Amino acid sequence: MEKIIIDENQFLRTISRISHEIIEKHQRLDNIVIVGIKRRGAEIAELIKKKIADLANVELPSIDLDITFYRDDLEYAEPDSKSPTYSGASSFISIHNKEVILVDDVLYTGRTIRAALDALVDFGRAAKIELVIFVDRGHRELPIRADYVGKNVPTSRSEEVQVRTLKFDNCYEVALLSPTK
């Protein structure tokens, strides 16, 4: 069973709110790099980057980060699935002494964020890393928390949260999928 929990209007308002929060929290924006975790986290990061540009008239540098080989669950991949390929980052931007805004779509166990933090080390030593999560669904296995949250959605472990974006799904919405009985 599927339930839409964030429609397109709510989705875009959430992007706007998170962007405002980032601007309000940072006195200077010229030391910020936005890093989006591929795939949907990168698209959400791009939306936030564009909104900040509209609001503050500043173009922030950004990176689309592939964390494939930093994950700790590759051995659990389906035996019939293709071998993972690493596409790296969209560009190399040093994050040394920069404030990094790390963006992902869903925060669940925390393992994706741990992998992203490991991957970021290859880009330098950040002055600070803050986390933007579009949907926090709970069930953490690691001590990870977001600095900016679009929406908290309590779920059961059997449910799935899907953040849908224009680039990958031809729409902006968030769906909660429950197993059929």
Swiss-Prot record:
Substrate binds at residues 39-40, 104-112, 137, 161. Regulates the transcription of the pyrimidine nucleotide (pyr) operon in response to exogenous pyrimidines. Belongs to the purine/pyrimidine phosphoribosyltransferase family. PyrR subfamily. NCBIfam families: PRK05205.1-5. Keywords: Glycosyltransferase, Transcription, Transcription regulation, Transferase. The keyword Transcription regulation applies. It catalyses: UMP + diphosphate = 5-phospho-alpha-D-ribose 1-diphosphate + uracil. SUPFAM superfamilies: PRTase-like (SSF53271). Pfam families: Pribosyltran. GO terms for biological process: regulation of DNA-templated transcription. PANTHER family: BIFUNCTIONAL PROTEIN PYRR. This is Bifunctional protein PyrR. The gene is pyrR.
